């Protein structure tokens, strides 16, 4: 690995869900320059930190690039995505999701990507108009809502509980309606950091790609390591992580641009988000 480095601290964001384990658990076994500092947090926190200049690069919600594309470049061939069911981004509902018009949906505040996605699915695909509140999906508001959007590890726990009659996998619904995969997160780097530290960005990008490949090869042992965090059986963890994809090929780029066009149509996204701009 290229050990490109200088004395400047490089702040790298990493989503603290087990869906990053094939990359991150491998990363943690490797030696890196001492000035490479990893910050673990939910996607929404990483989004804000990257936007505020508190991170230099890292995995963030796809939504973050869609609304502030002029601030970033995308690192090629890295994502958190799915070609169908993702298994950890669900709309849990007490009634048929197509009947949620005028009902209240409680949204997890952990990922702007999934908040926008569930609104696209309900309002554009299903033609219903619920009301939305943001809050703790395990708090008191959960008992008052007809539906709950949950992501990541908390979605895995809710799914296993069997509490809700309807569990809508948003990756699967998107795929059914668009015939495309869905990209939940990308690896983005701040534009000015790219310009000033291209060699460091190259080295970190190279390391992420290496970890991605190694992690897929070591998936069974990684599942034994991370499954207790949920908790879930290692075999279930293996099935779940096998469905998560980490590349960003042509179809995923098309899917990302389609999502961004929906955001633009909704008045949320920037017209500069399409076409994608890579490092």
What spans do the regions from the language model cover?
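Bilobed "Venus flytrap"/periplasmic-binding protein-like clamshell domains
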Residues: 2-29, 87-145, 153, 254-257
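Short, glycine-/small- and polar/acidic-enriched structural segments
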Residues: 15-102, 109-114
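Hydrophobic residues within well-ordered alpha-helices
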Residues: 49-51, 142, 263
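Pocket-lining segment of extracytoplasmic ligand-binding domains
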Residues: 134-222
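Secondary-structure end/capping motifs
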Residues: 195-262
């Amino acid at each position: 690995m290229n050990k490109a480095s200088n004395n400047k601290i490089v702040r790298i964001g990493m989503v603290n869900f087990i869906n990053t384990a094939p990359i991150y658990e491998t990363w943690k076994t490797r030696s890196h320059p001492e000035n490479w500092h990893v910050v673990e947090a939910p996607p929404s926190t990483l989004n804000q930190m990257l936007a505020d200049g508190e991170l230099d690069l890292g995995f963030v919600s796809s939504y973050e690039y869609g609304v502030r594309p002029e601030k970033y470049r995308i690192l090629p061939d890295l994502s958190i995505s799915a070609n169908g069911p993702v298994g950890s981004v669900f709309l849990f509902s007490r009634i048929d999701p197509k009947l949620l018009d005028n009902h209240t949906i409680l949204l997890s505040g952990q990922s702007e990507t999934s908040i926008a996605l569930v609104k696209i699915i309900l309002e554009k695909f299903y033609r219903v108009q619920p009301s939305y509140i943001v809050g703790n999906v395990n708090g008191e508001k959960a008992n008052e809502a007809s539906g709950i959007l949950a992501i990541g590890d908390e979605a895995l726990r809710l799914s296993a509980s069997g509490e809700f009659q309807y569990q809508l996998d948003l990756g699967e619904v998107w795929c059914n309606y668009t015939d495309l995969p869905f990209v939940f997160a990308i690896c983005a780097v701040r534009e000015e950091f790219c310009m000033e530290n291209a060699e460091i960005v190259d080295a970190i990008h190279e390391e992420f790609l290496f970890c991605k490949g190694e992690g897929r090869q070591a998936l069974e042992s990684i599942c034994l390591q991370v499954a207790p965090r949920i908790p879930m059986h290692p075999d279930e963890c293996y099935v779940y992580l096998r469905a998560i994809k980490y590349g960003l090929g042509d179809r995923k780029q098309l899917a990302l641009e389609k999502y961004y066009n929906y955001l633009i149509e909704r008045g949320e996204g920037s017209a500069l988000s399409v076409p994608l701009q890579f490092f």
